Design a protein with these regions (language model features):
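Proteins that catalyze or organize thiol-disulfide redox chemistry
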Residues: 1-134
């Protein structure tokens, strides 16, 4: 099911659909998360699902997907994560269709966002802009 947050639609992650977007020149952000992992939930509440970050995704025309790894038996999510060189969550890959499919990783440690949400958002947004605009 799609989830809309501040006007941004997060589609359920599907590797084939993501790669199709990339082939068409689109940049795809993937939120690898799980409901049982507090860091994931904190990052979403104080950084990823904020109006500032949503505006930046919209401004940069980024497709957003969520890979909910709450069920660790979901081998498709696990295999894709391992294929891109990651083994743990949270993980925030962005596949840059605008840069021939280059894969970059946005920071998973967004500072202690519960204490300094502005610092976490700034760090995330700055890195997102750097990857797309450089």
């Amino acid at each position: 099911n799609n989830k809309t947050i501040h006007g941004i639609t997060y589609e359920p992650f599907d590797p084939i659909k993501a790669l199709d977007y990339v082939k068409n020149g689109r940049d795809v952000f993937i939120d690898y998360t799980a409901v049982w992992w507090a860091i994931c939930q904190t990052n979403e509440q104080f950084v990823l699902h904020t109006e500032d970050v949503s505006k930046k995704f919209k401004e940069l025309n980024v497709i957003t997907m969520v890979a909910d790894w709450t069920d660790k038996e979901n081998w498709v999510l696990g295999d894709f994560l391992f294929e891109i060189g990651q083994s743990s969550i949270p993980s925030y890959p962005i596949i840059l269709g605008s840069k021939n499919g280059a894969i970059k990783f946005l920071p998973a440690q967004l500072s202690p966002p519960a204490i300094t949400p502005q610092a976490g958002k700034k760090k995330f947004i700055d890195q997102l802009e750097l990857f797309i605009n450089s």
